[in-house]
């Protein structure tokens, strides 16, 4: 489910026992350029897949594979051998009602160019905070690309603002999803306005929007090393699975063809 969400707005195709997601316009964004749903398991199959990956991502300075419990262990072992670094994601599911009551605040959809400019300003704060948390050197161009990639997803994803006195101070998105399972994602609140119920209000609104579009259960992906997972758990989301991103940064990249 989360793999389908990550592929929204990008080129995707099947080859050599895997699903490829690619966006040559935004080569620095890992989630826009990765491989998932790997079934290659024998040494020959794995060699063929890795060779195809080099062909399809020529000119891009990273390689990322998204894996879960269905991925052949032999393929994951090959990634470990070749020096890929693992980063986990926690998948959480809401089946019933949310536990907390919905705080009162204005929620409105992102629709206009001005809305997207406001989103871009908040996304810049989100990216800077992320860089500081993981002690990464500033890469403002990546933050700008993340903004553009998020916009590619709408529609079918719908972004929402939570506002105080008419000013957008938090955002989140909702997607009706596939096969009756919705997804909510990309939650951020301005650091100066946290603990005022904005995030909780957005979660309520986005879950309701998914269900209004036909979804029953709703999922969210969380960073197991960060604190938002605790908010989701307190509101009724339960952990159901862990999947992993295996990443390798290349020392140099050829010019994209």
Model-found features: residue ranges?
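N-terminal charged segments
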Residues: 1-60, 71-72
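Conserved beta-hairpin
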Residues: 12-16, 74-85, 156-172
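Short amphipathic alpha-helix that is part of the acyltransferase structural core
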Residues: 1, 34, 40, 90, ...
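Conserved acetyl-CoA-binding loop-helix of GNAT-fold acetyltransferases
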Residues: 46-53, 185-191, 195-212, 234
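Conserved active-site alpha-helix within GNAT-family acetyltransferase domains
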Residues: 72-86, 200, 224-242
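Conserved GNAT acetyl-CoA-binding A-motif
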Residues: 58-69, 210-223
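Acyl-donor-binding surface of acyltransferase catalytic domains
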Residues: 43-120, 128-131, 244-248
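A conserved beta-strand-loop-helix scaffold within acyl/acetyltransferase catalytic domains
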Residues: 140-188
């Amino acid at each position: 489910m989360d793999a389908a969400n990550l592929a929204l707005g990008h080129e995707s195709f099947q080859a050599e026992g895997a699903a490829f997601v690619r966006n040559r316009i935004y080569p620095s964004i890992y989630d826009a350029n990765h491989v998932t749903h790997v079934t290659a398991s024998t040494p020959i199959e794995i060699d063929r897949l890795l060779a195809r990956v080099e062909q399809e991502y020529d000119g891009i300075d990273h390689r990322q594979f998204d894996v879960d419990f269905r991925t052949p262990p032999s393929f994951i072992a090959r990634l470990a051998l070749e020096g890929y670094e693992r980063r986990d994601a926690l998948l959480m599911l809401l089946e019933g009602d949310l536990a907390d009551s919905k705080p009162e605040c204005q929620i409105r959809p992102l629709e206009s160019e001005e809305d997207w400019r406001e989103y871009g300003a908040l996304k810049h704060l989100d990216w800077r905070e992320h860089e500081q948390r993981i002690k990464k050197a500033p890469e403002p161009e990546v933050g700008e690309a993340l903004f553009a990639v998020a916009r590619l997803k709408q529609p079918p994803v719908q972004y929402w603002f939570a506002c105080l006195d008419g000013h957008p101070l938090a955002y989140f998105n909702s997607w009706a999803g596939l096969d009756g399972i919705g997804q909510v994602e990309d939650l951020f609140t301005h650091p100066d306005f946290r603990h005022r119920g904005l995030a909780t209000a957005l979660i309520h609104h986005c879950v309701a929007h998914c269900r209004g579009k036909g979804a029953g259960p709703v999922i969210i992906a969380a960073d197991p090393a960060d604190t938002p997972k605790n908010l989701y758990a307190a509101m009724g989301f339960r952990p159901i699975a862990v999947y992993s991103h295996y990443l390798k940064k290349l020392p140099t990249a050829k010019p994209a063809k």
